[in-house]
Amino acid sequence: MRAVAALLFLGLAACDEPPPPATLQATPAKFVGTWDVSLDDCKAGRGGSTVIVTADEVLFSDSHLAVTGALPDGANAARVDGHFKTEMAEWDGSIRLELADGGRTLNVVNGSTMTPRVKCP
């Protein structure tokens, strides 16, 4: 009986609607910039916690996302789709960018929320 229930559950999970398609070809400008954990980290230069967002890529210390599209979600958030690349793997996926504090703080969600970043001057 448990096997039947598990198969039904998996069947229902496979019926989930796909996410809506991206409506933009690039990351919205409000997210573009260099972001770090603190202004002191910004002054120190690019370190392990720096996130750099451009119109066509998002750079993390250990990976790179080549942007293929974006879908705004309200005034302060967007899903950014693209091709991820690390030293050991490549895959297609998405991240969510969320602005807070009047655009001064960036939250990046990629399965889990990263430490919030402040916008570097």
Model-predicted segments: where are they?
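Sec-dependent bacterial lipoprotein signal peptides
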Residues: 1-13
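Short, intrinsically disordered, charge-biased short linear motifs at domain edges
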Residues: 2, 27-30, 105-109
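Bacterial signal peptide processing site
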Residues: 15-18
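Tryptophan-anchored aromatic micro-motifs
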Residues: 27-43
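Short, solvent-exposed coil/turn segments at beta-strand boundaries
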Residues: 30-34, 50-58, 73-76, 97-105, ...
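Beta-sheet ligand-binding and adhesion/scaffold domains
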Residues: 40-41, 81-121
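N-terminal glycine/threonine-rich, aromatic-flanked beta-hairpin/loop signature
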Residues: 41-86
